[in-house]
Amino acid sequence: AQAAPVPRPVXLSKKTDSF
């Protein structure tokens, strides 16, 4: 639910993890 894509830990979100 965030406007800007933030680097998330692997596993949590693979889609946003690439950012």
Swiss-Prot record:
Q: Give the record's keywords alphabetically.
A: Glycolysis, Membrane, Mitochondrion, Oxidoreductase, Thiamine pyrophosphate
Q: Which GO terms describe its biological process?
A: generation of precursor metabolites and energy; glycolytic process
Listed under GO cellular component are: mitochondrial membrane
The catalysed reaction is: N(6)-[(R)-lipoyl]-L-lysyl-[protein] + 2-oxoglutarate + H(+) = N(6)-[(R)-S(8)-succinyldihydrolipoyl]-L-lysyl-[protein] + CO2
Cofactor requirement: thiamine diphosphate; Mg(2+)
Q: Which is one GO molecular function term here?
A: oxoglutarate dehydrogenase (succinyl-transferring) activity
Report the locations given in the UniProt record: Mitochondrion membrane
Question: Which domain of life, per UniProt?
Answer: Eukaryota
Question: What enzyme class is recorded for this protein?
Answer: oxidoreductase
Q: What is its main location?
A: mitochondrion
Q: What is its EC number?
A: 1.2.4.2
The record describes its quaternary structure and partners as:
Homodimer. Component of the 2-oxoglutarate dehydrogenase complex.
Function noted in UniProt = The 2-oxoglutarate dehydrogenase complex catalyzes the overall conversion of 2-oxoglutarate to succinyl-CoA and CO(2). It contains multiple copies of three enzymatic components: 2-oxoglutarate dehydrogenase (E1), dihydrolipoamide succinyltransferase (E2) and lipoamide dehydrogenase (E3).
Question: What family, per the record?
Answer: Belongs to the alpha-ketoglutarate dehydrogenase family.
Q: What is this protein called?
A: 2-oxoglutarate dehydrogenase, mitochondrial
Organism equals: Solanum tuberosum
Read off the lineage from the record: Eukaryota, Viridiplantae, Streptophyta, Embryophyta, Tracheophyta
